[in-house]
């Protein structure tokens, strides 16, 4: 049924309303943050996750089509959000964790779905907005060696908050994600604020 759904139209319905609100706030000079969730979390709100995991094992080709459709819609939405003035996109697939998926399934999902999608978004958004990853997603990327942390390089003596780090990183990094977005007001030493660098596709080819 999911595959039978039409392509997301960002100019109609709730998506259009959200994007219009983002546009108004951006025009008023606000730094707009938009929350977006990943495929597993979206599917969790639609069907029993046991059916999803069974499909990933028994019918991976079908599930790949489902993931790709969701990712295509997410891509359209995120690009439209940036065009509307959004500067930070909070992105996470919080249901995609070891306790829920198990280490083997999570590793495969991270390497085969999460990493390629985030690479795609980094290319499409061209650092016009920062993607602030949920720490659970960031840890999964680091744990599978799909990404690494790099200091933002903030000036010493600024006593920044985590939120200050986001603003500094816009246009310089594609991703951050060392802490939850709720910790935005927490002060962090300059040298402890990190951007996230995705593993290059060329590194994978070399390993193979």
Model-derived segments and spans:
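A contiguous, low-structure linker/loop signature
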Residues: 1-7
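Active-site loop segments of alpha/beta catalytic cores
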Residues: 10-208
């Amino acid at each position: 049924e999911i595959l039978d759904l039409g392509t997301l139209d960002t100019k109609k319905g709730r998506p259009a309303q959200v994007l219009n609100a983002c546009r108004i706030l951006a025009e008023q000079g606000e730094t707009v943050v938009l929350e977006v969730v990943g495929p597993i979390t979206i599917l969790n709100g639609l069907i029993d996750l046991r059916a999803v995991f069974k499909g990933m094992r028994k019918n991976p080709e079908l599930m790949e089509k489902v993931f790709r459709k969701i990712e295509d819609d997410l891509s359209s939405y995120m690009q439209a959000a940036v065009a509307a003035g959004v500067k930070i996109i909070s992105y996470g697939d919080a249901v995609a964790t070891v306790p829920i998926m198990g280490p083997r399934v999570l590793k495969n999902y991270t390497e085969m779905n999460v990493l390629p999608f985030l690479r795609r978004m980094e290319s499409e958004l061209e650092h016009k907005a920062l993607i602030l990853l949920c720490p659970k997603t960031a840890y999964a990327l680091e744990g599978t060696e799909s990404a690494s942390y790099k200091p933002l390089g903030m000036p010493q003596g600024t006593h920044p908050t985590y939120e200050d780090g986001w603003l500094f990183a816009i246009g310089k990094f594609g991703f951050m994600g060392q802490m939850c977005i709720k910790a935005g007001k927490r002060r962090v030493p300059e040298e402890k604020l990190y951007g996230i660098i995705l593993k290059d596709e060329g590194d994978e080819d070399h390993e193979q």
